[in-house]
Amino acid sequence: TLVSLKFERLLSMPHYTLGTQKVTIEALKGDIEVELRAYLSFDTLHESLNENFWECPVHKVSENSLQIMGVSKGTHQHLSATCIFDDTGIPTKSLAPNSKEISLVFRKTIKEKGAYALTRIASIDKIEADDASDRIMKAAMQGLSQYSFNQLLAANKAWWENQWEVSDIQIDGDDENQQGIRFCIFQMHQTLHTADHTAVIGAKGLTGEAYNGNTFWDTEVYCLPFYLFNNPEAARSILDFRYNTLPEARERAKALDLKGAFYPIATISGKECCDLWQHANLQLQASTGVMYGIWLYDLLTGDAAYLFDKGAEMLIEISRMLSSRGAYNTRTGEFGFYCVMGPDEFQMMVNQNAYTNFMAQKTFRYTLALLSRMRNEVPDQYQSLVNRLALLEEELENWMQMADKMILLFDEHTKLFEQHEGYFNLPITKLEDIPVEEFPLYSHWAYDRIYRNSMLKQPDVLMFMLLFNSDFSKAVLEANYEFYEPRCIHESSLSPSVHSILAAQLGKEIDAYNFFGFATRMDLDNYNRNTREGLHTTSIAGSWMNIVYGFGGLRSDGALLALSPSIPSAWNSYTFNLNYKGTLIKIHVDQEKVTLCATNPLKLRLYQLEIELDQTAKSYLIERA
């Protein structure tokens, strides 16, 4: 007997709750008897905890359909799973009251040279707890009947073709990174591609249970730029999640004896999920990261309605939190933050962390600018917001004063920002003196030993110098890069991309390419030996930034988009696109020139030159930093 088995399956991108499977069995030699068993199952174990977290109160089985509803034990979230088949089978004979698995059995005789195909169309969707599950599940069943495998396949193909037209990055001369960056782009689209205000981007995306699906402060910093230039609707959903969890952020602030809203450092539902107080209580970058996300969304979309409807409220509450978390120095009268932890988690309970203070100052000033804009452009909406939040003029005056008096430890002579008070006095441990077997330090050193050194886990000063790049001269950027880069051990997968981007800006081609070396293939090649736990989603987003913001030299923090492309000597050329306010910009870079065009007339800055693009491709000589 010789048998051919063909398995086809897909998860629909345009219809994001749908999936389909098709099994084709062909009897190549001899007659065969086959039995196929198709399941819907919630009988899965959390890998690290070895525990099942589902209850299944609803089951429905017919000769050509299955339905089951799962309710998560801890958070009581409802998930409906429904599927229909294009053939009739034998239902599960008996079910326990809370069975987590249902099935249909299909038995067939296939004659030699004959074939049998079984197709399933499935829907998996969230249900609000107070919705009528019977009504929702019945509607799901009726909805599935309008689709076929071929329809879903064709729609999926069209969706991906459209996405690659916008999102593709092409590298000539580096097949490994060509494959790697396309893998990264594919994963970013799979992770989030629709306007779902309840969606979060977990540290592992949808690919693993590590970090329990929680999103972290770096979502707005690393992931949002990708979506803003490739899928603005998905970008807005990231901010929607923060707006819809504003009540939880307010409760978190109260728990920390603060005003306003304190966004959690790790969350899946809006509530703080980090059980390490030194991270959960001391890190303010989740809140200032929300500010950065709103600011960048405003800058790159011009969506004033969203800003006025939702952004302003979040900014007011974040500013209230920062004003109550910070304090004035009794000796100098300057304002700053005490007992905090910045992005570099190797330094705890520090005073005047540079990133924290800088981002807080930006938050105060952006909030004030937005409220002034609302007062002029939408006075009625502004007054309604003021009344609803009981916003006082005195608060605005205080925020202005706090921003003006913010402590920023900058030395005009050395052009260095001190990462925090006393950082320059910390003992220096040379990285080459640490035995290889002691890495990662988090797993091999006592916490207090880590805190007693000037080593960095990931960039802190360099982080805000990337986010607000146009605020800093090349001399200041170079001084800080030269000082902090040798002290960073990159124990976060997010760290190399920041250094690569800034190295490219400074003309440090070897540094830029070396830091880029692991970016696109971290999970494909399992560099960190932990891909089995899930993909490094924010690092994958950083890989896209590494090419577009790094070698492409994109800067999106000014009035105009700015490009300063460079190219690794190992590459012949590369091409990427930017979807900016409805205009598609195409950028091609080779070893001699930069060629650009746009679907609509658009001004941008190329190196030091302001140019206007249109549909006709224009070429300019590449400039070496």
Residue ranges and their predicted role:
Residues T1-Y211, W445-R449:
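Acidic/polar, glycine-enriched structural segments that form the non-catalytic walls/loops
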Residues E165-Q170, Q187-Q190, V221-P232, Q278, ...:
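Well-ordered alpha-helical scaffold segments within catalytic/enzyme domains
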Residues L192-T207, E233-Y292, D298, A305-L307, ...:
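Helix-terminus loop motifs that line ligand-binding clefts
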Residues S167-A199, A203, N357, Y382-Y423:
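Gly/Pro-rich turn-and-neighbor structural signature
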Residues T215-Y243, D309, R365, S372, ...:
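Active-site core of glycosidic bond-cleaving carbohydrate-active enzymes
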Residues T207-T215, A261-D309, R320-M400, V594:
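The feature captures the catalytic groove of carbohydrate-active enzymes
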